[in-house]
Each structure stands twice: as C-alpha cells, then as structure tokens.
Regions:
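A hydrophobic/aromatic-rich effector-binding and dimerization subdomain
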Residues: 2-10, 17-24, 84-124
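Histidine-centered metal-chelating micro-motifs
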Residues: 59-61, 68, 77, 81-90, ...
Length: 124
C-alpha cells in the first residue's frame, strides 16, 4: 500500500496521475495522510477511476461541485469516476488519515453499458 502525501497531476490538467493502475490491474490501494499534505488538503482533482475511502483517523471536509460533506473517523464515502473533488483536514484535528481504494468501475459493473453499470454504478 502506497503512502500518499500529495496529488500529482497529468501535465496541463487537474487529472490525477495514478502510478500503478493499468488495464492489466485496474486497482490501487493507498494510505493518505492528509495532515501531512501541503495546506492539510488534497487540491481539486479528478480521475477516470472510482474511489472508495474509509476514514481511519480524524475528520475531513470533502468537496465536489455539487456540495460538501464531512467524514469522521470510522465513516467512509464513494466518489464515482470523472468527478472533480478535493478534501481538507478539519480545523483543530491532529492526525487525519484515510484508506483509499481506487479502481476502474468496470471492476464492479462487468462491462460498460451492462445493466449493473446502467442501474447501479453510473448513476452514483
């Protein structure tokens, strides 16, 4: 599991560079120490992959163009592919850490356009 302390972008874009993810193995797991990131935040970014996360320590504010949500230790969330998002450690928090699972949505839908994809994955 890779420890993340900053977001790396593809040149000229807000698309996150995700080393290690490929068509052969469309999944990566990482441990994000948000309190050790510059500005205690992960800047606005997006990726083609879906993201499932679990808050291990502390709490953070998660932003998308559609709104904000606060996640505390023991809670988690899901961000679908191609969704612009950012997160920041809540004020007054010490350690803020999350476990991230980033994967191609086809891993759970089977194939693009399948009933599982149309009914349960794409609408998220």
């Amino acid at each position: 599991m890779k420890i993340i302390r900053k977001v790396e972008f593809k040149p000229g874009s807000y698309e996150e560079e995700l080393p290690g993810i490929s068509a052969e193995f469309p999944y990566i797991a990482s441990y994000v120490e948000l309190d050790k990131c510059a500005g205690r935040q992960s800047p606005w970014h997006w990726h083609k992959e879906a993201e499932l996360f679990y808050m291990e320590q502390g709490s953070l504010e998660y932003d998308t163009p559609h709104g904000k949500a606060v996640f505390t230790a023991g809670s988690g969330g899901f961000v679908n592919s191609n969704v612009l998002h950012m997160s920041r450690a809540k004020e007054g928090e010490g350690s803020v850490a999350a476990l991230l699972h980033i994967f191609n949505p086809l891993l759970i839908s089977g194939q693009s356009g399948s009933i599982i994809d149309r009914k349960y994955v794409s609408p998220l």
